[in-house]
């Protein structure tokens, strides 16, 4: 798979991955359920409102996904970002984080998604908010449940469970304008270092509503 920094056009991303894990005899005895997870860019050419009154798209990058029991193996709020997360958040390059986390799977643009899981499993992902220095989308709290307490699959639009995070590795510039952001930077490490920690984004800039940038849908996978 070829991984590149985000473009500046609307992108529809869907991931096709098969994740099977054996995490103990009880879990292994539970039947597996196959899901289709779609991570879709719904940006338009004017999603971002720029200081000069014009607009710009807010594309998503390639990303990385994981199914497991924990909140997220990719990041923890209040902790410094790993090198891999830094690469993902600053340049949309998932290679590093995929190498750091056993079982993590990279995904690119326009790829179909199939996730196989058992009750108790959770799904997480990270994709760069392309018009930023080091922001990324991921589930709130790190991951989202795939089953309810009764073991039934949770299907439908899950976008409301997603948040925009700041990796804390590079000082934020005005989204869609900053010279050290995805579409305009020459290298992924050219921005001013921040030496911070991962938090839900909280700065002086305005960002588009979640539903104008990304849509995450979980559905039953078609029978093979």
Predicted features by range, described:
Residues 30-34, 42-147:
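Structured domain cores in non-transmembrane regions
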Residues 53-65, 74-78, 84-90, 146-224:
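Extracellular low-complexity, O-glycosylation-prone Ser/Thr/Pro/Gly-rich "stalks"
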Residues 2-13:
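Bacterial N-terminal signal peptides that target proteins for export
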């Amino acid at each position: 798979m070829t991984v590149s920094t985000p473009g500046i056009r609307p992108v529809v991303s869907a991931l096709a991955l098969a994740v099977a894990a054996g995490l103990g005899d009880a879990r292994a005895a539970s039947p597996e359920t196959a899901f289709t997870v779609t991570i879709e860019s719904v940006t338009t050419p004017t999603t971002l409102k720029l200081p000069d009154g014009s607009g710009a798209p807010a594309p998503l990058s390639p990303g990385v996904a994981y199914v497991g029991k924990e909140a997220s193996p990719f990041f923890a709020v209040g902790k410094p970002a790993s090198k891999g997360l830094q690469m993902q958040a600053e340049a949309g390059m998932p290679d590093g984080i995929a190498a750091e986390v056993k079982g993590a799977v990279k995904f690119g643009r326009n790829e179909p998604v199939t996730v196989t899981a058992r009750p108790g499993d959770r799904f997480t992902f990270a994709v760069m908010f392309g018009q930023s220095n080091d922001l990324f989308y991921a589930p709130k709290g790190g991951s989202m449940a795939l089953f309810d307490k009764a073991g039934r699959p949770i299907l439908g639009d899950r976008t409301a469970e997603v948040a925009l995070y700041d990796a804390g590795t590079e000082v934020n510039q005005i989204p869609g304008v900053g010279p050290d952001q995805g579409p305009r930077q020459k290298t992924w490490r050219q921005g001013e270092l921040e030496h911070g920690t991962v938090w839900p984004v909280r700065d002086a800039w305005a960002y588009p509503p979640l539903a104008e940038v990304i849509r995450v849908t979980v559905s039953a996978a078609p029978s093979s």
